[in-house]
């Protein structure tokens, strides 16, 4: 499992740090949060820094995860950001009418059939979903603000629409504070630690150890 891979990354002796290689357009906010909290917990326990290296993309849940690192490095053309929440679906009301299908649903609980795609869209149902999205979006914004700290300028956040699900190139992400610098994993870490540093990889992260 991913948790075991992360634990293995932090389990070596004389670890100088852990590098996360991130290439993700996003996913579940819950899973992103759980993984991030575990990384931070192990980082504090082992007293080692964590570095995130974004390859093609760290968007939405992928960026949530990147924020678990102490520093975020990107490539100039990496895609970074998308700090927002989305849900999507389809409506099949007219389709079942045309093909002559009668749908029968039996449920208990007023909201059990929330946003049923075979029923006309109900404004009350939509409000339930948008309220939930607003809550999760605020959690995401709070997390980014907490982890990036004073590297995020309040005026820049508003001007650039950072918390409005906007995406940025790696170069621009560095300018607005979503990333720290341009850099490739081995080059950055050799400059930071030692030219003779040893890289020990797992499926999900790289353990950095000095000779």
Task: Give residue ranges: language-model regions.
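N-terminal organellar transit peptides
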Residues: 1-75, 86-211
């Amino acid at each position: 499992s991913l948790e075991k891979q992360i634990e293995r990354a932090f389990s070596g002796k004389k670890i100088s740090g852990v590098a996360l290689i991130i290439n993700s357009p996003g996913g579940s906010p819950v899973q992103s949060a759980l993984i991030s909290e575990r990384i931070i917990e192990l980082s504090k326990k082992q007293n080692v820094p964590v570095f995130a290296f974004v390859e093609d993309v760290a968007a939405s849940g992928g960026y949530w995860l990147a924020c678990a690192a102490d520093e975020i490095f990107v490539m100039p053309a990496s895609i970074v950001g998308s700090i927002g929440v989305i849900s999507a679906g389809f409506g099949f009301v007219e389709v079942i009418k045309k093909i002559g299908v009668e749908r029968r649903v039996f449920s208990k609980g007023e909201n059990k059939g929330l946003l049923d795609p075979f029923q006309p869209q109900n404004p009350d149902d939509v409000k339930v979903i948008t309220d939930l999205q607003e809550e999760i979006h605020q959690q995401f914004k709070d997390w980014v603000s907490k982890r990036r700290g004073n590297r995020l300028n309040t005026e820049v956040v508003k001007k650039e629409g950072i918390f409005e699900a906007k995406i940025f190139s790696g170069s621009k992400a560095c300018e607005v504070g979503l990333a720290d610098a341009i850099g490739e994993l081995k080059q950055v870490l050799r400059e930071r630690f030692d030219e003779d540093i040893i890289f020990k990889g797992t499926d999900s992260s790289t353990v950095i150890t000095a000779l």
